[in-house]
Amino acid sequence: MKEIIIYTDGACSGNPGPGGWGAVLAYGEHQKEIAGAEADTTNQRMELMAVIEALKAIKGSGWEIRVYSDSAYFINAIQKGWLENWQRNGWKNSKKEDVANQDLWKALIPLLRKNRVRVEKVKGHSGDRWNERCDQLARNAIKSLG
């Protein structure tokens, strides 16, 4: 099966504040870098945007995709079943409060279903080449806001 590796990261200058996201997609010898920014956002939103935009950048379906992220928020929502629980519980968390960032989680769901996506935690700022590159892309995107 064809496999794509994705690294993602989000960053915020203040939380909330100006934020950016970056992603590196790799397929064999091919690589693509993407990034974006928002003037008023949170770090968690930027972490999710990085994953959403990376998955949107993939053409077609039926891919085996491995997403590496340093976001415990994103990784735990997938690996620990939070996302499924939130949907089942009418988008309420374990405290019976509205789930934060519902708009992004709802945008992510069909993208996760389109391909076979596995997520893996990478330790942030630990020297991982691709995580560091994504962080740089996200921070450069923030600077582009002016």
UniProtKB/Swiss-Prot annotation:
Molecular functions per Gene Ontology: magnesium ion binding; nucleic acid binding; RNA-DNA hybrid ribonuclease activity
Chief site of localization: cytoplasm
Binding site for Mg(2+) 2: D9, D135
Quaternary structure annotation from Swiss-Prot or TrEMBL: Monomer.
InterPro entries (UniProt xref): RNase_H, RNaseH-like_sf, RNaseH_domain, RNaseH_sf, RNaseHI
PROSITE patterns membership: RNASE_H_1
Name of the protein in its database record: Ribonuclease H
Record keywords: Cytoplasm, Endonuclease, Hydrolase, Magnesium, Metal-binding, Nuclease
Any one GO biological process: DNA replication, removal of RNA primer
Record: residues binding Mg(2+) 1: D9, E47, D70
Entries under CDD domains matching the protein: RNase_HI_prokaryote_like
Encoding gene (name): rnhA
Catalytic activity: Endonucleolytic cleavage to 5'-phosphomonoester
UniProt keyword Transferase present: no
Record-listed E.C. numbers: 3.1.26.4
Domain RNase H type-1 positions: 1-143
One Pfam family per UniProt: RNase_H
PANTHER family from the UniProt entry: RIBONUCLEASE H1 (PTHR10642:SF26)
Localization per record: Cytoplasm
SUPFAM superfamilies in the cross-refs: Ribonuclease H-like
